[in-house]
Swiss-Prot record:
<dbReference type="GO" id="GO:0009881">
    <property type="term" value="F:photoreceptor activity"/>
</dbReference>
<feature type="modified residue" description="Glutamate methyl ester (Glu)">
    <location>
        <position position="266"/>
    </location>
</feature>
<feature type="topological domain" description="Cytoplasmic">
    <location>
        <begin position="2"/>
        <end position="14"/>
    </location>
</feature>
<feature type="transmembrane region" description="Helical">
    <location>
        <begin position="40"/>
        <end position="55"/>
    </location>
</feature>
<keyword id="KW-0157">Chromophore</keyword>
<feature type="transmembrane region" description="Helical">
    <location>
        <begin position="15"/>
        <end position="29"/>
    </location>
</feature>
<dbReference type="GO" id="GO:0006935">
    <property type="term" value="P:chemotaxis"/>
</dbReference>
<keyword id="KW-0807">Transducer</keyword>
<keyword id="KW-1003">Cell membrane</keyword>
<keyword id="KW-0716">Sensory transduction</keyword>
<dbReference type="Pfam" id="PF00672">
    <property type="entry name" value="HAMP"/>
</dbReference>
<comment type="similarity">
    <text>Belongs to the methyl-accepting chemotaxis (MCP) protein family.</text>
</comment>
<dbReference type="InterPro" id="IPR003660">
    <property type="entry name" value="HAMP_dom"/>
</dbReference>
<feature type="domain" description="Methyl-accepting transducer">
    <location>
        <begin position="221"/>
        <end position="459"/>
    </location>
</feature>
<feature type="modified residue" description="Glutamate methyl ester (Glu)">
    <location>
        <position position="473"/>
    </location>
</feature>
<keyword id="KW-0812">Transmembrane</keyword>
<comment type="function">
    <text>Transduces signals from the phototaxis receptor sensory rhodopsin I (SR-I) to the flagellar motor. Responds to light changes through the variation of the level of methylation.</text>
</comment>
Length: 536
């Protein structure tokens, strides 16, 4: 591949010849070590190389020049070729391509000349036909001017009516009593379009009013949920407060039990102080029994409060279900509004690409966008309601668990009360018999230890009750915040989407349904809904 590439390059071949000559000079100089001989050999080599190269180059140039001269003299069949593969061969190939292109252009010019002669004959025939057509066109022009004048008058009347309709007066209609079927068709289609548009605007007005009314009802329901959540927070706070009180009383009971234990140890250490210690233990036992009774009463009160809280949460869950139904209604209304926008888009497409159709299309797009925004708001409300429902169920479960813990705490307090009564009996036995003091002291110590364990267990349950009540309060507060978010979303929806829809519809004037039914004038406008939902 390298040899073939070098053969196609004249400069490369010449350079290789000079390199070979230089190599020869170096070889002669090294061999003979004679400068004059080296110079003579170099000159001889260069002359020989130049002669060979010049002879070959001159021959190639003469060959190409002769072929090119014959082509220049008009012999386009003469091919221009060369046996060389270097730049001279490329030159011959380029001249050959030019010859072939020139021959093709000449053939094309011959064909074009023949076509021109044929076209000239056809043009003469066409001129005669054009003269006849000119006369017919003049007659048709006169007829067209008369018809255009009639169409212009009718179109002017149509245009005035359509301009009035474009400003929002949907009561405008055109007079279709004309002798021209095309204009009559246009007028009939326009009147039908205005009837459909008027009905659509009237329907959209009704839907907007219904959406506003239902949104107001949802706002009222949301306010009820907030109030209910506030009551629940108050009830749970009360539960937490009572649990704290219970914890305080249990701590007091634990202190009393510790006193009883200390008394028992002193009885075992010294018999002399047995009487006074027995009185202290009896006093502490009475106090512990009173505290246990009080704690039992508090447990009963907490259980009642928890039952009330459960009822309120269940009522809140029912109200959330009602909100879900209302969201479903809003979703249906959004879908119906979207269907109205689709029908309006179809009517706009039927009206064509004129200014009225474009204006109607803009209104249809606005209604469609509003329907989509309504759907998005409904989806957001549904998501919030779903979150509130989940939180309500969590609160219900937590309160149910709290009630179970309270019932368990009540049983524990009753057990503690029974233990304290046992302590009192043990103290009576100590007072009746000094001989049995050691056995009684041992039993009392065991009973006191059991009582301390029970009191500690009840204290732990009280802490759990307090924590659960705090969690329930936080959950209900979160539920109330969710209800407030629902109310804010409803208010934003009412202040933006509904009012925007009513504002859009308020820009149109439509005929009353009573006037259309009675066959009265279509110029009677119906009351339009303003931005505040009233008449405009």
């Amino acid at each position: 591949m390298t040899i073939a590439w070098a053969r196609r390059r004249y400069g490369v071949k010449l350079g290789l010849g000079y390199i070979a000559t230089a190599g020869l000079l170096v070889g002669v100089g090294v061999t003979t070590n004679d400068v004059p001989s080296t110079i003579v050999a170099g000159i001889a080599g260069l002359l020989t190389l130049g002669s060979i190269n010049a002879a070959e180059t001159v021959a190639s140039i003469k060959e190409i020049a002769a072929q090119t001269e014959r082509v220049a003299n008009g012999n386009l069949e003469q091919e221009v070729t060369s046996t060389r593969t270097d730049e001279f061969g490329s030159l011959a190939d380029s001249i050959e391509q030019m010859r072939q292109s020139l021959r093709g252009r000449l053939n094309e010019m011959e064909r074009t000349r023949a076509d021109l002669e044929e076209t000239q004959a056809e043009a003469e025939t066409a001129r005669e036909e054009a003269e006849q057509a000119k006369q017919e066109a003049q007659a048709a022009e006169r007829e067209a001017r008369e018809l255009a004048a009639t169409y212009q008058d009718t179109a002017k009347r149509y245009g005035e009516t359509m301009e009035a309709a474009a400003t929002g007066d949907l009561t405008q209609r055109v007079d279709v009593d004309t002798d021209h079927e095309a204009m009559e068709t246009v007028g009939t289609a326009f009147n039908q379009m205005m009837d459909d548009l008027q009905a659509t605007v009237r329907t959209v007005t009704t839907v907007a009013d219904e959406i506003e009314a239902k949104t107001e009802r949802m706002s009222e329901t949301s306010a009820d949920i907030e109030a209910s959540a506030g009551d629940t927070v108050e009830a749970v706070s009360k539960i937490e407060s009572q649990a704290n009180d219970q914890r305080t009383e249990l701590d007091s009971a634990a202190d009393d039990v510790q006193q009883v234990s200390a008394s028992a140890e002193e009885i075992a250490a010294t018999i002399d102080d047995l009487a006074s210690r027995s009185e202290d233990v009896a006093t502490a036992s009475d106090a512990a029994r009173d505290s246990s009774k009080s704690a039992l009463d508090e447990m009963s009160s907490i259980e009642t409060e928890v039952d009330d809280a459960v009822g309120q949460v269940e009522q809140l869950r029912d109200q959330v279900a009602e909100i879900t139904d209302i969201v479903d209604v809003i979703t249906d209304i959004g879908e119906q509004t979207n269907m109205l926008a689709l029908n309006a888009s179809i009517e706009a497409a039927r009206a064509g690409g004129n200014a009225d159709g474009d204006g109607f299309s803009v209104v249809a797009d606005e209604v469609k966008d509003l329907a989509e925004e309504t759907q998005d708001r409904a989806n957001e409300i549904a998501a919030v309601v779903e979150k509130v429902t989940a939180q309500t169920e969590d609160v219900t479960a937590s309160i149910q668990q709290t009630r179970t813990r309270v019932e368990s705490g009540s049983e524990t307090v009753e057990s503690t009360l029974r233990d304290i009564r046992t302590i009192a009996d043990s103290i009576a036995e100590v007072s009746n018999s000094i001989d049995e003091i050691q056995r009684t002291t041992s039993e009392q110590a065991e009973t006191v230890q059991s009582t301390a364990t029970s009191v500690e267990r009840v204290a732990g349950l009280s802490d759990d009750t307090t924590a659960l009540a705090s969690d329930a309060e936080s959950a209900v507060i979160g539920q109330r915040e969710s209800a407030e978010e629902i109310a804010a979303s409803l208010e934003q929806f009412q202040n933006t989407a509904v009012e925007q829809l009513q504002s859009r519809v308020a820009s149109f004037t439509v005929a009353t349904e009573d006037s259309e039914t009675a066959g009265g004038s279509v110029e009677q406008p119906v009351m339009r809904a303003g931005a505040d939902g009233g008449g405009a």
